[in-house]
Protein backbone atom coordinates (compact mmCIF):
# COMPACT_ATOMS: atom_id res chain seq x y z
CA UNK A 1 0.00 0.00 0.00
CA UNK A 2 2.83 2.39 0.84
CA UNK A 3 4.35 1.67 -2.54
CA UNK A 4 1.14 2.66 -4.35
CA UNK A 5 0.84 5.89 -2.34
CA UNK A 6 4.47 6.70 -3.15
CA UNK A 7 3.95 6.07 -6.87
CA UNK A 8 0.74 8.13 -6.99
CA UNK A 9 2.41 10.96 -5.06
CA UNK A 10 5.40 10.95 -7.41
CA UNK A 11 3.15 11.05 -10.48
CA UNK A 12 1.14 13.95 -9.03
CA UNK A 13 4.31 15.91 -8.24
CA UNK A 14 5.56 15.35 -11.80
CA UNK A 15 2.25 16.52 -13.27
CA UNK A 16 2.21 19.67 -11.14
CA UNK A 17 5.86 20.41 -11.99
CA UNK A 18 5.19 19.94 -15.71
CA UNK A 19 2.18 22.28 -15.66
CA UNK A 20 4.14 24.90 -13.71
CA UNK A 21 7.14 24.66 -16.06
CA UNK A 22 4.88 24.96 -19.10
CA UNK A 23 3.19 28.10 -17.75
CA UNK A 24 6.49 29.65 -16.69
CA UNK A 25 7.99 29.32 -20.17
CA UNK A 26 5.04 30.44 -22.28
CA UNK A 27 5.50 33.60 -24.29
CA UNK A 28 2.61 35.99 -23.92
CA UNK A 29 2.07 37.39 -27.39
CA UNK A 30 -0.45 40.07 -28.24
CA UNK A 31 -1.84 39.95 -31.75
CA UNK A 32 -1.52 43.40 -33.33
CA UNK A 33 -4.80 45.21 -33.66
CA UNK A 34 -6.24 47.63 -36.16
CA UNK A 35 -4.03 48.64 -39.05
CA UNK A 36 -0.76 47.55 -37.44
CA UNK A 37 1.43 45.55 -39.81
CA UNK A 38 1.27 41.82 -39.19
CA UNK A 39 4.33 40.04 -37.72
CA UNK A 40 5.20 38.37 -41.01
CA UNK A 41 5.11 41.59 -43.05
CA UNK A 42 8.52 42.17 -44.62
CA UNK A 43 9.95 45.31 -42.97
CA UNK A 44 12.87 45.79 -45.35
CA UNK A 45 13.31 49.42 -46.29
CA UNK A 46 10.42 50.70 -44.18
CA UNK A 47 11.19 53.58 -41.82
CA UNK A 48 11.67 52.54 -38.21
CA UNK A 49 8.66 53.55 -36.12
CA UNK A 50 8.67 56.58 -33.88
CA UNK A 51 8.58 55.07 -30.42
CA UNK A 52 9.06 56.31 -26.88
CA UNK A 53 9.92 54.02 -24.00
CA UNK A 54 11.18 54.38 -20.45
CA UNK A 55 14.83 53.88 -19.63
CA UNK A 56 15.82 52.23 -16.35
CA UNK A 57 15.82 55.62 -14.62
CA UNK A 58 12.18 56.15 -15.62
CA UNK A 59 13.03 58.83 -18.18
CA UNK A 60 11.64 58.93 -21.69
CA UNK A 61 13.92 57.56 -24.39
CA UNK A 62 13.23 57.50 -28.12
CA UNK A 63 14.51 55.54 -31.05
CA UNK A 64 15.11 58.88 -32.80
CA UNK A 65 17.95 59.53 -30.32
CA UNK A 66 19.98 56.94 -32.24
CA UNK A 67 19.50 58.44 -35.72
CA UNK A 68 22.79 58.36 -37.59
CA UNK A 69 23.81 55.08 -35.95
CA UNK A 70 23.23 51.51 -36.99
CA UNK A 71 20.92 50.13 -34.29
CA UNK A 72 20.02 46.55 -33.47
CA UNK A 73 16.69 46.76 -31.64
CA UNK A 74 16.42 43.55 -29.62
CA UNK A 75 13.13 42.59 -27.93
CA UNK A 76 13.95 40.20 -25.09
CA UNK A 77 12.89 39.07 -21.60
CA UNK A 78 14.83 37.99 -18.52
CA UNK A 79 13.14 34.55 -18.50
CA UNK A 80 13.74 33.85 -22.20
CA UNK A 81 16.32 31.07 -22.76
CA UNK A 82 17.08 31.92 -26.43
CA UNK A 83 17.55 35.56 -25.36
CA UNK A 84 20.06 34.41 -22.75
CA UNK A 85 21.98 32.52 -25.45
CA UNK A 86 22.21 35.55 -27.73
CA UNK A 87 23.12 38.18 -25.09
CA UNK A 88 26.88 37.35 -25.13
CA UNK A 89 26.88 37.89 -28.91
CA UNK A 90 25.14 41.24 -28.47
CA UNK A 91 27.69 42.27 -25.83
CA UNK A 92 30.50 41.32 -28.20
CA UNK A 93 28.94 43.22 -31.13
CA UNK A 94 28.51 46.30 -28.93
CA UNK A 95 32.21 46.14 -27.99
CA UNK A 96 33.39 45.42 -31.51
CA UNK A 97 31.32 47.95 -33.48
CA UNK A 98 30.40 50.77 -31.08
CA UNK A 99 33.29 52.96 -32.28
CA UNK A 100 32.00 52.55 -35.86
CA UNK A 101 28.58 54.00 -35.01
CA UNK A 102 26.68 50.87 -33.94
CA UNK A 103 24.63 50.15 -30.85
CA UNK A 104 22.35 47.46 -29.53
CA UNK A 105 19.14 48.72 -27.92
CA UNK A 106 17.66 46.05 -25.66
CA UNK A 107 13.91 46.37 -25.14
CA UNK A 108 12.83 44.30 -22.15
CA UNK A 109 9.33 42.92 -22.50
CA UNK A 110 9.14 41.61 -18.94
CA UNK A 111 5.67 42.26 -17.52
CA UNK A 112 7.28 43.29 -14.22
CA UNK A 113 9.39 45.91 -16.05
CA UNK A 114 12.18 47.49 -14.04
CA UNK A 115 11.45 45.20 -11.07
CA UNK A 116 12.54 42.20 -13.18
CA UNK A 117 15.30 43.88 -15.18
CA UNK A 118 17.29 45.62 -12.42
CA UNK A 119 18.08 42.45 -10.42
CA UNK A 120 18.86 40.57 -13.65
CA UNK A 121 21.35 43.24 -14.77
CA UNK A 122 22.92 43.42 -11.31
CA UNK A 123 23.41 39.66 -11.05
CA UNK A 124 23.97 38.20 -14.51
CA UNK A 125 27.38 38.01 -16.18
CA UNK A 126 27.88 36.50 -19.61
CA UNK A 127 30.83 34.59 -21.02
CA UNK A 128 32.31 36.68 -23.83
CA UNK A 129 35.66 35.42 -25.13
CA UNK A 130 36.54 33.92 -21.76
CA UNK A 131 35.50 36.97 -19.72
CA UNK A 132 32.41 37.28 -17.54
CA UNK A 133 30.81 40.57 -18.60
CA UNK A 134 27.61 42.47 -17.81
CA UNK A 135 25.26 43.69 -20.52
CA UNK A 136 27.01 46.74 -21.97
CA UNK A 137 24.30 48.28 -24.11
CA UNK A 138 21.26 50.44 -23.34
CA UNK A 139 18.22 48.67 -21.93
CA UNK A 140 14.75 50.19 -21.99
CA UNK A 141 11.35 48.93 -20.90
CA UNK A 142 8.95 47.97 -23.67
CA UNK A 143 5.25 47.20 -23.77
CA UNK A 144 2.59 45.98 -26.21
CA UNK A 145 2.24 49.45 -27.76
CA UNK A 146 5.96 49.54 -28.64
CA UNK A 147 5.80 45.99 -30.03
CA UNK A 148 2.74 46.89 -32.14
CA UNK A 149 4.62 49.81 -33.70
CA UNK A 150 7.23 47.31 -34.89
CA UNK A 151 4.48 45.15 -36.39
CA UNK A 152 3.87 42.87 -33.43
CA UNK A 153 5.98 40.04 -32.09
CA UNK A 154 5.54 36.30 -32.40
CA UNK A 155 7.96 35.63 -29.53
CA UNK A 156 11.32 36.50 -28.08
CA UNK A 157 13.92 37.33 -29.02
CA UNK A 158 12.93 39.40 -32.03
CA UNK A 159 15.47 41.79 -33.52
CA UNK A 160 15.35 44.62 -36.04
CA UNK A 161 18.44 46.08 -37.67
CA UNK A 162 17.99 49.76 -38.43
CA UNK A 163 20.27 51.60 -40.86
CA UNK A 164 21.91 54.97 -40.21
CA UNK A 165 19.11 56.66 -42.13
CA UNK A 166 16.44 55.10 -39.90
CA UNK A 167 15.17 52.28 -42.13
CA UNK A 168 14.54 48.72 -41.03
CA UNK A 169 16.89 46.58 -43.10
CA UNK A 170 16.50 43.22 -41.34
CA UNK A 171 14.06 41.47 -39.02
CA UNK A 172 14.86 38.23 -37.22
CA UNK A 173 12.25 36.36 -35.19
CA UNK A 174 13.86 33.97 -32.76
CA UNK A 175 17.48 33.30 -32.03
CA UNK A 176 19.81 34.91 -34.58
CA UNK A 177 23.01 33.08 -35.46
CA UNK A 178 26.32 34.71 -34.61
CA UNK A 179 27.38 34.63 -38.26
CA UNK A 180 24.11 36.12 -39.52
CA UNK A 181 24.29 38.86 -36.90
CA UNK A 182 27.88 39.76 -37.79
CA UNK A 183 27.16 39.81 -41.52
CA UNK A 184 24.03 41.96 -41.12
CA UNK A 185 25.77 44.54 -38.92
CA UNK A 186 28.87 44.75 -41.11
CA UNK A 187 26.69 45.28 -44.19
CA UNK A 188 25.45 48.54 -42.64
CA UNK A 189 28.73 49.96 -41.30
Residue ranges and their predicted role:
Residues 108-110, 141, 172:
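Residue-level recognition of beta-strand->loop/alpha-helix junctions
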Residues 67, 75-92:
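Conserved redox-active cysteine motifs that mediate thiol-disulfide chemistry
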Residues 1-50, 171:
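N-terminal targeting signals for export/organelle localization
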Residues 45, 50-71, 94-97, 150:
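A short beta-strand-turn-helix
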Residues 118-164:
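Short, internal strand/loop/helix patches
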Residues 34, 155-189:
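Thiol-/selenol-based redox modules, centered on thioredoxin-like
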Amino acid sequence: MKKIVLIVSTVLVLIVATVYADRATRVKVKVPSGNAPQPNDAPDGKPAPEVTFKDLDGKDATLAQYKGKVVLVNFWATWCDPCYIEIPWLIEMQQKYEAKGFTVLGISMDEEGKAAVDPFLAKERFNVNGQKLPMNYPIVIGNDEVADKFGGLLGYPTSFLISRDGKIVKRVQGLISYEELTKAIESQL
